C-alpha cells in the first residue's frame, strides 16, 4: 500500500489524544524543558501557513527533548481579547464572546490537524473569567505598590477607532495595526510605572539567550542616557528652567534655551507681545504625533517667548524659545541648545539666526555644520584645554558645588499608557468615589466582567463603551452603602499576554495565579518562539510584569524567557495590475516570463500573506493534499528558521516525495515490513554515515538549524534506498531521527518495525565519535554566477550542500531582500543562487 497520510495522521492524532501522551506533571526526578509559542489571537480568518512555522519549530524541539529524557511542558492557549472581535460586534451585533469562542474552535481544529504535541489539558483563553480574575488581581497588586496611577497626559488618539494607543502602537503617525491616522490629545488615563524598572529591564537583558538585534531594540527603546540636570535662572525673578543634557561640558557653548510646547513654564514666562504667536504655535504642535515632531529630517520650527535665561557658567543671556522637536516626555522637556555641537540645534540656530559658539576644538568647518565629536575644550573658561571626558566631570562637580546642577540618568522609556476606550478587554477593577479618590475593588469581587451592551462603539468624545451601561457603572462600595462608580476604561490586549506563560503551569489553581511548586519547577521558559515584531511590546511588558511579580514573591526568577528565537516570515507571491488590483494566484498564468490574469498583464511580487492581497495559503488545503508531515517538513526545509522565505507549492511536492521514499525504506507493496530490512551489520560506509547523521542532526536541532537537519535525513534516506539489504539498526535510527519533524509517519514506521508502543519516549540515538572522523573540503557559493563566498564543510556533503550554503551567515546576508529564482547545485564543488531583487 502506498504512503497515505489521510489515514495515518488521524490515526496517530487520535492515539496521542486518547492516551494523553503529552499530558505532563511535575517530576522532580527528571530535568524539565518548558517550550512556549507566542499564543495566537484567534481571528476569524483562521491560520495561514505562516502560523505553523514557529509552532513546528517548538514541536520539533519538544519531541526531541522527550526522547532525550526531559519532562516537557508544551502548552497552547488563546490571546482572545482584541479589537477585531469588537469591530465584528459593531458590524453584526454578535457579542465578541460568541465570535471569539467560534474562532477558537476553528483555530484549535487547524492546530490539532498538524500533529503538535501540546498538553491540551492546560488550554485557556485570556477571556476566560477564571483567567480575567488573576489578570485583574495582578493589576490590583500594581495599584497597591504605586505602579498603577491616573494622570492627565498627551495621548495618541485614533479618531477612526475612537481609542487611545500606546506609543509602541504608533509608527509614522499611524496605528500600526490598521494604518489609521493618529493625533495627539490630552486625556486622563491609567498609566503603569514601567520606568521604575528601567535599569533592571536593561540589566536583565545581559543574561538572556536572545537575538542580539532584539536585545538592542529593547536597549534602544529604554534609552538610558547619563548626563546632568542644570538650572538656568530666568531674568526678573520669573523662576528657573531645569534642563537635562548628556553633554554638560558644552555649557559655555549654549546660546539659547528650548522648551517643549507642553512645558508648564511656557505660560508663566511668555511676554505679552509674544503670547498670541506662542499660543498659535503650541496649538499647531499639539496636533502632531511625537515621531513626526522628533523626525531628524524635518524642518526645525519654533517661536520666541520673549523671555531670557541666564547661563550659570558665564552669565550669558540666553533667549528662551518653544520648539516642537523638544518632547515633554523626555528629560525635563527643556534643552540647552549648543548649535556648534548638535546637528538639530545647528539647524534651528541657522534658521532663526541665533549665535553658534564653538567650544570643542576640531578641524570641522563650523560654517558648514555641527561638530558632534569630542576634543579639547575652547572658549570654555576654566574648562578650556581639558579633553571632553575630563571637562564633563569637572563641570558636573562645579555645578554641584554651586548648587546649580547635578548628575542625572534619564531614559527614553516612558510609563506605559495602559487604559483603552474599548469594550472587549478586562475591566479595570477600581471604584471612583464622590470625593475623587480611587479605591481597589476587593479581591473577593473578582473577576469583574464587562456587562452586556447593545452598542459596542466608543463615543467620539473619548467616552468608553462601558459608560453606556449605567446600571453596571453606578454601584456601591462592597459591604457598605457608599455610592461609587466603576472605571469604564478597559485594559489593553497586552495585559492578558503579560503573564499567560505562568498560568500554563497551574491553570486550575483557584487560590493564586500560579502555585509555588509549579512555578519553581517549570520556570523560566526554556525556549520561547515568536515574531520579532513584539520586541518592544509584549516582550518588554511581560518582563516588566514578571519583575513586579518577583518583587511581591509570586515568582522565583527575575526573567521569564531564558531563550528566545524569532522565526522569519513565510511570504507568498502576489499578483497586481497597473491599477493596484490584486488577483488570486490560481487565476494567473505565465507566458514567456510575463504574468497574465486573463488578458490583463500583472506584476508578480513576493509579499507578506494577506487576505487583501489574495495570496493567503490555508494549511488545511496543504494538509488535505499533501499531509501534515509534508507541511511541517517543508516549512523546516525552506531555509533558516529566522529568515524570510517565499512559499513554493512545488517544494511541498518534493518533500512529499521524500516521505514516500521514507515509507518505501521500511514498507513493502503489501503494507508489511520490507523484506530488505534485515538484522544485518551495516557496511563501514553506511555505519559511518549513520553516526555522522546522528551527530549533525542532534547538533542542528539544538542550534535550531532545522533545514540542514532535514537535508541530512534526506542524505541518509538516499543511502538506505540504495542498499540491497537495509540494516535494521540504521533504518530504526533513521525513523527515530525523523520523528520530531514528521511524527505521524515516524510512529507508523516504528510500529511496522515491530514496536508496540509510541516512540515518544524512545531514547534518542547516540553516536560514536571514533566512527565519524569526517573529512572536509572547501565549497564555493556563487550568486548569479559570481563567487561571493567560500566555506569549509564535510567532504561528502552531497545534496545537503544546498542547505549548508544557505545557513552560512554571509550567504544569508547576501540573499537578504532578494528572491531566489533558481538554485544550481554542483555536488562536491559549488552552489549558484540565481536571484532577483524584491
UniProtKB/Swiss-Prot annotation:
Binding locations of ATP: 611
Motif stretch ('KMSKS' region): 608-612
Compartments where located: Cytoplasm
Molecular function terms from GO: aminoacyl-tRNA deacylase activity; ATP binding; leucine-tRNA ligase activity
UniProtKB keywords: Aminoacyl-tRNA synthetase, ATP-binding, Cytoplasm, Ligase, Nucleotide-binding, Protein biosynthesis
Enzyme type, top EC level: ligase
GO cellular component assignments: cytosol
This enzyme's EC code(s): 6.1.1.4
Domain of life (superkingdom): Bacteria
Catalytic activity: tRNA(Leu) + L-leucine + ATP = L-leucyl-tRNA(Leu) + AMP + diphosphate
GO biological process: leucyl-tRNA aminoacylation
Motif ('HIGH' region): 40-51
SUPFAM superfamilies tied to this protein: Anticodon-binding domain of a subclass of class I aminoacyl-tRNA synthetases, Nucleotidylyl transferase, ValRS/IleRS/LeuRS editing domain
Similarity remark: Belongs to the class-I aminoacyl-tRNA synthetase family.
Cited PANTHER family: LEUCINE--TRNA LIGASE, MITOCHONDRIAL, LEUCYL-TRNA SYNTHETASE
NCBIfam families for the chain: leuS_bact (TIGR00396)
Annotated protein name in UniProt: Leucine--tRNA ligase 1
Organism the protein comes from: Rhizobium johnstonii (strain DSM 114642 / LMG 32736 / 3841)
Gene: leuS1
